[in-house]
UniProtKB/Swiss-Prot annotation:
Catalytic activity entry: RNA(n+1) + phosphate = RNA(n) + a ribonucleoside 5'-diphosphate
Similarity comment: Belongs to the polyribonucleotide nucleotidyltransferase family.
Gene source species: Streptococcus equi subsp. zooepidemicus (strain H70)
GO CC, alphabetical: cytosol
Cleavable signal peptide: none
Superkingdom classification of source: Bacteria
Annotated protein name in UniProt: Polyribonucleotide nucleotidyltransferase
EC id: 2.7.7.8
S1 motif domain span: 625-693
NCBIfam families per the UniProt record, alphabetical: polynuc_phos, PRK11824.1
Major localization listed first in the record, in broad terms: cytoplasm
Alphabetized UniProt keyword annotations: Cytoplasm, Magnesium, Metal-binding, Nucleotidyltransferase, RNA-binding, Transferase
Function as written in the Swiss-Prot or TrEMBL entry: Involved in mRNA degradation. Catalyzes the phosphorolysis of single-stranded polyribonucleotides processively in the 3'- to 5'-direction.
Enzyme class: transferase
């Protein structure tokens, strides 16, 4: 196929899609140019079905530093593992694409997005999402798209689609929404305590823009799309399915209704083992043994799936016996750990998270060097999910995509209420350790994080709580669930996480397994989540009503002073010699910003005071009218040089020593003598003149004799 180009304008920027010129051996490939951002997307599919019990979809978002005209960092000077932002963007693209493949599709699919040029005012992630949908849609891969995504900002009461950098910085909302022509199927958002009504409106505005992009894609697919390949779907034998349901469904139904998680798992596992053993014995010698046993396992999974959904939609009974809008039992505790700067333990049913706070000097902030200009990240929220939290063994090591994503969600939720740098000049790190999990662990980490921040004395604007909402839908009827547990998440249609304060929402995240949900469901889920959020906030506020007025004794104390910008080099010294000497002498940490704000950190207040005195003396300037107790350091014929303080000397001219005439300076002063002087002049070169006589009254002039007076009259 020769190169074909499709052009439109979207959100005020040119949008160009090129097909047929590059990556022609992939099943589908596109180059998307949005503004001056350029993204190459290639989609490929394996020829055979994988043997696993899940759909092996891999979406990558690769940031090439040359795209922003930058050299990679590190001694190797080449791109390495994906950045956190790249990982989050890959997840952002994966989530709306995954539901658009048929049930039972098991061929491996890879969608690789490579950022070739980067324009910070034209969203490369949204170009990559468009390219991913298009590459799949024009290929022979059986993808039931297209989908599209947009970013939505909220500035001065107006919604803006795909905002530029300045608009993003002014926005009260950072929303990414994706979906099909008919419905929304993915949401990711941070917000500055916005009400549910505005969030819902933002979603609808975003979906309207999505429909424009889908119409554009449909034109391209009609022009260059390939016929979809015929692939084998994982399907079970109907007669085998009917037999197992008839024989074992009653036993499995009973097991599913056991309320406690571990007991329920044991009961369902016992039924499954019984069935597997029976069919293993029957088909041990059959040449189709492996396929049959795979089918048996899949049928049992489908039976459990169907029963959980039936109980909720028909009987309005959840696996643990709760009402559809009922939260599991809650517990909260602060100061779980000694020595740390703050800690909070939050428990919701069988989900438990411990959050630990660490405060540090601003010099410890994380430096982010990606495609955007380098910047410092003050707040970090890390989420760890050890396998023991679900009673299993498993992999341990670096954080995976899921842990990075859950950590970022908590970070967005809590960042909205943090004090400004001027109010609280610390770098802040929260680490959420999931100790037990039966669903909604990311939201438990947000609640635990609030407890840790308040216990640690961080003056947050308001406490934040999070809740996960679920959905069971048969296409006609649906049920929205509050505080979903693991089984409801696994077998349900939606995982909709909502975090916020009493004033409004600070973060949203939604993933669904169906092709989309309606505005009505979104509205109902947001309203139900608000009720649950307030219930959790009641518990948090009962545990700790407001942030503590003092930091933990182990937290670094801080003091700040302001110096003139031209004095920064004086404090730092040649090659950092002066500041290193201060740090070595006092044991403090010192940060100096470009505006002359000096922050001094230590757990020892005396050390802070000493460092502050040293810095103050280094930048101290003599001022006209001020009096100093000085020491004579040099004597010349024309006057004496005196040291006012540190390395600051002044000249006391011979005429300024006394009101009477001084013949020789050395007759009056000697080196090492201490005298009081008053500064009378500082010239534009910083040279200082001082006076001794200005500190004593001027003696009266002697009166003239009467004789002279009389003579004068004559």
């Amino acid at each position: 196929m020769s190169k074909q180009t499709f052009t439109t304008t979207f959100a005020g920027k040119p949008l160009v899609v090129e097909v047929g010129q590059v990556a022609k051996q992939a099943n589908g490939a596109t180059v998307v140019r949005y503004g001056e951002s350029t993204v190459l997307t290639a989609a490929v599919m394996s020829k055979k079905m994988s043997t696993g019990d899940f759909f092996p979809l891999q979406v990558n978002y690769e940031e090439k530093m040359y795209a922003a005209g930058k050299f990679p960092g590190g001694w190797m000077k080449r791109e390495g593992r994906p950045s956190t932002d790249a990982t989050l963007t890959a997840r952002l693209i994966d989530r709306p694409i995954r539901p658009m493949f048929a049930e039972g599709f098991r061929n491996e699919v890879q969608v690789i997005n490579t950022v070739l040029s980067y324009d910070e005012d034209a969203s490369a992630p949204m170009a990559a999402m468009l390219g991913s949908s298009l590459a799949l849609s024009i290929s022979d891969i059986p993808f039931n798209g297209p989908i599209a995504g947009v970013q939505v900002a909220y500035v001065e009461g107006e919604f803006i689609i795909n905002p530029d950098k300045a608009q993003q910085e002014a926005s009260l909302l950072e929303l990414t929404v994706a979906g099909t022509k008919d419905a929304i199927n993915m949401v990711e958002s941070g917000a500055k305590e916005l009400p549910e009504a505005i969030m819902l409106e933002a979603l609808l505005v975003g979906h309207k823009a999505i429909q424009e992009l889908i119409a554009f894609q449909e034109e391209i697919v009609a022009a260059v799309g390939k016929e979809k390949a015929e692939v084998e779907l994982l399907q079970v034998a109907a007669d085998l399915q009917a037999e197992i349901i008839e024989t074992y469904n009653a036993d499995l139904q009973q097991a599913v209704q056991v309320e406690e998680k571990k007991a329920r798992e044991a009961a369902t596992e016992a039924v499954k083992e019984q069935v597997m053993a029976a069919y293993e014995e029957r088909y041990a010698e059959d040449e189709e043994h492996d396929r049959i046993m795979r089918d048996v396992a899949e049928i049992l999974e489908q039976m459990e799936h169907a029963e959980v959904r039936r109980l909720i939609t028909e009987d309005k009974v959840r696996p643990d016996g709760r009402r559809v809008d009922e939260i599991r039992p809650l517990a909260a505790e602060i100061d779980f750990l000694p020595r740390v700067h703050g800690s909070g333990l939050f428990t919701r049913g069988q989900t438990q998270a411990l959050s630990v706070l660490t405060l540090a000097p601003m010099g410890d902030t994380q430096i982010i060097d990606g495609l955007e200009p380098e910047y410092k990240k003050r707040f970090l929220h890390h989420y760890n999910f050890p396998q023991y939290s679900v009673g299993e063994t498993g992999r341990y090591g670096a954080a995976g995509r899921r842990e990075i994503g859950h950590g970022a969600l908590g970070e967005r939720a809590l960042a909205q209420v943090l004090p400004s740098l001027e109010e609280f000049p610390y770098a802040i790190r929260l680490v959420a350790e999931v100790l037990e999990s039966n669903g909604s662990s990311s939201q438990a980490s947000i609640c635990a994080g609030t407890l840790a921040l308040m216990a640690g004395g961080v003056p947050i604007k308001a406490p934040v709580a999070g809740i996960a909402m679920g959905l069971i839908s048969d296409g006609t009827n649906y049920t929205v669930l509050t505080d979903i547990q693991g089984l409801e998440d696994h077998f349900g249609d939606m995982d909709f996480k909502v975090a916020g304060t009493r004033q409004g929402i600070t973060a949203l995240q939604m993933d669904i397994k169906i092709e989309g949900i309606t505005p009505q469901i979104l509205e109902e889920a947001l309203a139900q989540a608000k009720k649950a959020r307030f219930e959790i906030l009641d518990l948090i506020e009962a545990t700790i009503a407001e942030p503590r007025p003092e930091l933990a004794p182990t937290a670094p104390k801080i003091d700040t002073i302001k110096i003139d910008v031209d004095k920064i080099k004086v404090v730092i010294g040649k090659g950092g010699e002066t500041i290193d000497k201060i740090i070595a002498e006092t044991g403090v940490k010192i940060d100096i910003d470009e505006e002359g704000n000096v922050s001094i950190y230590s757990s020892d207040q005396d050390a802070i005071n000493r460092a502050k005195e040293i810095i103050a003396s280094l930048v101290r300037e003599a001022k006209v009218g001020e009096v100093y107790h000085a020491k004579v350091v040099r004597i010349e014929k024309f006057g004496a040089f005196v040291n006012l303080f540190d390395k600051t000397d002044a000249l006391v001219h011979i005429s300024e020593i006394a009101w009477s005439r001084t013949a020789n300076v050395s007759d009056v002063l000697e080196i090492g003598e201490e005298v009081d002087v008053k500064v009378i002049k500082v010239d534009d070169k910083g040279r200082i003149d001082a006076s001794m006589k200005a500190l004593v009254p001027r003696p009266p002039k002697p009166e003239k004799s009467e004789a002279k007076k009389e003579g004068k009259h004559d």
